[in-house]
Amino acid sequence: MTAEEFLQEALSHEDKLITDRRYLHAHPGTEFDIQDTLAYVKKELIDMGYDPKECGKAGLVALAGGKKPGKVFLLRADMDALPMPEEADVDFASTNGKMHACGHDMHTSMLLGAARLLKAHEDEICGTVKLMFQPAEEVFEGSNDMIEAGVLKNPDVDVALMIHVMAGMPLPTGTAIVCDGGVSAPAADYFTIRVQGKGCHGSMPNNGVDPITAAAHIITGLQEIHARELALSDEAVLTIGTIHGGGASNVIPDSVELGGTIRTYDEDVRSFLKTRMTEIAEGIATSFRATAEVSFGSGCPTLTNDADLSACTVSYIRELLGMQKAFTADQLNAMSGDKKAPKTAGSEDFAYVSQKVPSIMLALAAGTPDAGYCYPQHHPKVKFDEAALAQGSAIYAYTAMRWLSEHC
């Protein structure tokens, strides 16, 4: 079968891909709490003839091929949504206060589509394709949970690929941007800072210790790390995303809790940032007669892309979609007049897989601003062009089959 025939076969399943995606979009779950999604994906795989196995807290694994000896190619899709109400103008919007605002419903639908293609061509697969349906990417816990449960073993994975759709890119839907070799996504760490004071009546602040004032100064102080303690080359982002404290306008509360994330590309910078955040928060709190406790929660390392796998992937996608539908990030940037592609500031827990086996991450354009896809990921009004679904499913399946055939 030619690449063109393979693409046409993928396009013939477009209606089913859209049906899958819209069900998943309308029934989102978050973190590991994705029962509706899990049940749907499992049933679809069984109906195709797979024998899906649960992996970790809420993951699924299925195998295609295995009839011929060869290597193992892992394809990964994340399944979780975000804890935010949807405002997108679509008929299939979610109504449960959660939303697929990052496109994970698209990823899951595409991998189901790839599973359908792989099953139809199972006798042609040299080796095995392992399908990884993963929960809890948004909290950076799902990938590592599945790794600890053995997703990369039995059979042992040789290489891995993930796709992430991107809305609002000025590129035709279905254009693939393949990460170059090296680090493409930063390490990420969630943190909380609990500032403990002493509550009192708002008219008599002298009788208490105001944690809100201390927290405000801590927020300001933390910004000085980047401004005055990191070198220009020390790429890092520190964001406070939540502030919780108090319940009445005339009462100074006992405590305030801040929450946020840090993103870094270098482990030394990551460690330094954590140390200084703790020192600054504790020091400022003490100066206001309060105390501060800094804790770091879930996170993920940097995502490292394999240069050889990147080159192969670009070549395969060009066979499938054409020369103008696949670029490395550096190639795309050179076309725009810049010499080097900027790194993304968004983290991705597929990084855990990339630390274990040669891996590649690619972005798939899913709607231009001119066509009305003007909101970014994580926005309550974001929408994705479903025309990317068939192309994404074809990329998943074709890339795996081509790589396996060349590396038997």
Can you annotate each of these PLM segments?
Residues 2, 13-20, 33-44, 71, ...:
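General structural feature for long, well-ordered alpha-helical segments within catalytic domains
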Residues 24, 62, 75, 104, ...:
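Divalent metal-coordination and catalytic microenvironments
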Residues 53, 137, 181-185, 340-344, ...:
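Short Gly/Pro-enriched turn/cap motifs at secondary-structure boundaries
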Residues 76, 191-193, 361-366:
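Non-cysteine beta-strand/loop elements that form the S-adenosyl-L-methionine
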Residues 82-84, 89-99, 106, 123-242, ...:
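Histidine/acidic-residue-rich, glycine-tolerant segments that coordinate divalent metal ions
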